[in-house]
């Protein structure tokens, strides 16, 4: 079975672990058994993640791709378990030395181990390699047990229009500055996907959607993760034309985001922080949207015309619990693993 998942960073990576556990992929391959024997059918499953690139930025001359790296480190077993991003056993000597020089930005730190990833990526970009090939090369080191695809090889960065807290002017800043420096706590007016007008989804991304047996939308931020993926020309059309069912998972539980600041992002675009509102924001494929099925928390409700809805536990407490979420979505879509 070919499974394609649209994901952001930390939450998306944890969701992918659940998919892997359900299908016996990646680090869970040896754990899946049938009648006491290894399940050889696990080898027939293929997992592809289409990953947000809207967070990507140039930091200290290095190309940083936070969501791609978080997925790669998480699935490869090297992520910091406390933060949910970055390297395990990270050190920060380079960051400390840059601070002594007064180098800006001082609000975004790169770990010493993490810098190795960014150096390789930047060197390959300078040599003319596209991001898709670079990501595949980086994954050779991490062996994530899934194909990680940047949605595009082109620049398509999320910027945020704010009121500057210092002088009151209205200006656009990179999403990383809004998220990391200001913690989304400044007057915010809109989001813009810079470069989208010239960007295009990669052929690999379009093929992963067209060839899938089921397409899952992880409970990632619907505005700056999934929304940024959908902003890349070609993606929405490919989803609407896909032969596979599309199953989405609500990032909102009981009116609060599963993690991160999705509620702040939704407020900016005028969408309520409810499972139903986010489902309506994505919309039904029978209409002009992208959903066939929508999973919400047991404590939530959603009535969306043209979309099959089911309430199940959505807390990703561990890969096993997440695998149950994934399984429930497949059942709702009528897909048998």
UniProtKB/Swiss-Prot annotation:
Binding, 7,8-didemethyl-8-hydroxy-5-deazariboflavin: 69
Pfam families hit by this protein: CofD (PF01933)
Cross-referenced InterPro entries: CofD, CofD-like_dom_sf, FbiA/CofD
EC number: 2.7.8.28
Keyword hit for Glycosyltransferase: no
Keyword annotations of the record: Magnesium, Transferase
GO MF term set: LPPG:FO 2-phospho-L-lactate transferase activity; magnesium ion binding
Disulfide bonds: none
Protein's name according to its UniProt entry: Phosphoenolpyruvate transferase
